[in-house]
């Protein structure tokens, strides 16, 4: 129900009265006539949660997670292929399968050309001509200075050739800006071991790096030159000329003032490789005697990357060279690798549009946005009535909440220049060039634009954030809450299902909003800029926030992850702190919005009690899953995991850790004791 309708309904409800009954002398004065009671509202939606999954032999105040899904846990068997099984794991087709099946005439034309062309075909001839023309038109051969060589390289990139750099959008100063990244594309697959492949293939985008280490944003400088007292490092000056050739304003592109900062903090070996690669280019660029010759050789090697896409013959030529290359370690060209590279780097925006058009019903975006407004209102009240923050910090928090961008389902508009058109293409090589150029066109269209208008576009073109993912997330650089289609489609949201289930699943909205105020998000202001003091107006407020978050760490540290299989092994409350703050805050927000709705709709008595209990039972269902020791070690503790430990708690703690700190859970089930019981003074409230 839209927020405006809710408010109107509440106002009407508050004005309803009852006519007084006249009491005569003959009436029994000891039994006054009662006012007639309005019958309680009833849930019109379907309560589909299977209560046979519950294990009522478990005392709910000892382990609410197992109380909710314990029988299902006992009856579900893991196998060698699955260290964890989530709810709906057996539903076919899965959401991912449905997304992967989406296509249209344009996209299918590209997919049909994913093959090595016959050397004698028109496709091969067209590709060869295109390949040759790019080099001629770029001016590379005629360039006589290092600067002109790099500008020619930029022109080649604008025509579709891969570059040594990649531009990724991110939020900065309230606008969409671009950060310079390293681009090392490859169509070959190595024969190295799977464990080596996993480690090497791990990518670190600067957008993610800034989210994890926001202090690095203090070292950002425009590629064009100086910003205040900071200036672009000399070792990266060559980048400016590539951007000029590409037709992109260096003023809108950023890099780090001191890349050594990354090395010192040992963010990852992959980042260190980026630094080494950049330094190699700059070293050659400043070689007065050999720069032009050596730079041309490096560029032609990158240009030659796409040679294999011309035909079967050129693919075989490249493969023969790979076999004799000791550094290639037996790598071979793979169409699967071509497809993966294109889909990850250049197709997320097009595929996001397919998801929006073919999976999201008309009107659903607006319907869900109305619920977002309810959540904003609830969170705003919680901030205003917060007992431990000063008025200054409250104002900062409210300003940030009110400035937050709510990206739901899909962008409000699609930028035509950023959508590859394969209708006139004749070859796979041309398709690849089209994808690269349209990505650059999309970046040109959004760079410098307000985060309010184009943050969703910037994210929808990112393989880590495109619309086909089963995800919702908060982006501190844009100060945006992003709910992708998966979370507004059944079974997560369905207008026909129980009101309880829908509102409980709105904890996703509350969760992502709360991330803007967790240990990391609170360091960013309303425009998405990192500030040393964050949203805190006083040191006392920050100290109190830290004290409360430390209590939450200790709370989660006290939980046994798998009491039977791993006795004595506790959860990691420190690693998961940010997500635990968001889980607790998000559930509190969703529950309060739910109570507001119940009041408006007129729930009373036993029906009201039932609805409150079902909210928490639905929380247990949301995190229904079965996992074992292997999953706990790999995911929760990061043993053997190249990505390290997960920042999310395990499912059991995502339920038990939340309810144990919510007064409303104790009230709903009349809880007075139990292993999860925490005295009122010990229940942690942050947001």
Which stretches of residues belong to each language-model region?
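Noncatalytic, helix-rich "gating/capping" subdomain that lines the substrate-entry/channel surface
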Residues: 99-375, 411
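Zinc-dependent metallohydrolase catalytic domains
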Residues: 145-148, 157, 370-506, 515-687
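Stable alpha-helical elements in mature extracytoplasmic
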Residues: 57-61, 68, 91, 95, ...
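Sec-dependent N-terminal signal peptides
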Residues: 1-8
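Active-site-surrounding "flap" and adjacent substrate/cofactor-binding loops of secreted or lumenal enzymes
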Residues: 42-43, 59-62, 67-131
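Short, Gly/Pro- and small/polar-rich lid/capping loops
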Residues: 39-52
